[in-house]
Amino acid sequence: MKPGFSPRGGGFGGRGGFGDRGGRGGGRGGRGGFGGGRGGFGGGGRGRGGGGGGFRGRGGGGGRGGGFQSGGNRGRGGGRGGKRGNQSGKNVMVEPHRHEGVFICRGKEDALVTKNLVPGESVYGEKRVSISEGDDKIEYRAWNPFRSKLAAAILGGVDQIHIKPGAKVLYLGAASGTTVSHVSDIVGPDGLVYAVEFSHRSGRDLINLAKKRTNIIPVIEDARHPHKYRMLIAMVDVIFADVAQPDQTRIVALNAHTFLRNGGHFVISIKANCIDSTASAEAVFASEVKKMQQENMKPQEQLTLEPYERDHAVVVGVYRPPPKVKN
């Protein structure tokens, strides 16, 4: 066997790149080593059909691989990873996705994109593509489902994300702002994103992001204590949560009771291992849904994030729905 070759997996070390969480083949490796954060240098969805962190998603034709990266390893059945994206927009069409504010870039590879609120700026080194519409040039940013749970849910076919132009969103667990930047693109200049992050190190990145994007309001505070930042945040339409804590449903509920309007919606990303690493993922998801129901949060759909994330699910629902009027 060749050194550094793992049987099932695109690239070095199964899922993700050169070490990124180890994957099924490589040594454990820091969470991001050479792999540029989940799904890095060639590790596509769970090693099957990698193609450079595959950007192809379940929506696009073709295998799960065939990425938007340059080159990319072959993985199993994943086509070659495609050349560098079309910077100039030759032979590229952008069409609206059914979720308002989200678009699909159709070219040699299909990719999920959002309209860049700050043209000319990349947030985390993502590809950008400019499309000429009449005299104007509109710039779109590629949205990588291996680095964003929300993009993974959209490509997985989630029915509603409730995040749309003009919406006010409370984002719990904002980290460095990778997904937050795309949410900021979607809600546009008329919307707002309150981004809550406890880590000061990630918070610095978030504050720098907010300097350029005026619709992001960074809150460097613990989401367990919403009363500490209630003076900063108005009522919101949607809560998006990616906090990966054992008591995350309680954290979301506390914030919902404080900031979410009645009839507002929530989108929660659940990582089974973070809640109970001994139970099966399905059992964990079911128990979290039960907890939500006890908090006046009514789940409407649940979706696993395969092939982008292992043992993750997204639950979308409505908070304190108005009572149905009986005729």
Swiss-Prot record:
Its EC number is 2.1.1.-. Coiled coil: none annotated. GO terms for biological process: ribosomal small subunit biogenesis; rRNA methylation; sno(s)RNA metabolic process; snoRNA localization. The modification Asymmetric dimethylarginine is found at R8, R15, R21, R24, R28, R31. Residues 1-95 are annotated as: Disordered. It is found in: Nucleus, Nucleolus; Nucleus, Nucleoplasm. Disulfide bonds: none annotated. It catalyses: L-glutaminyl-[histone H2A] + S-adenosyl-L-methionine = N(5)-methyl-L-glutaminyl-[histone H2A] + S-adenosyl-L-homocysteine + H(+); a ribonucleotide in rRNA + S-adenosyl-L-methionine = a 2'-O-methylribonucleotide in rRNA + S-adenosyl-L-homocysteine + H(+); a ribonucleotide in U6 snRNA + S-adenosyl-L-methionine = a 2'-O-methylribonucleotide in U6 snRNA + S-adenosyl-L-homocysteine + H(+). It holds the Pfam family Fibrillarin. This is rRNA 2'-O-methyltransferase fibrillarin. It comes from Mus musculus. The gene is Fbl.
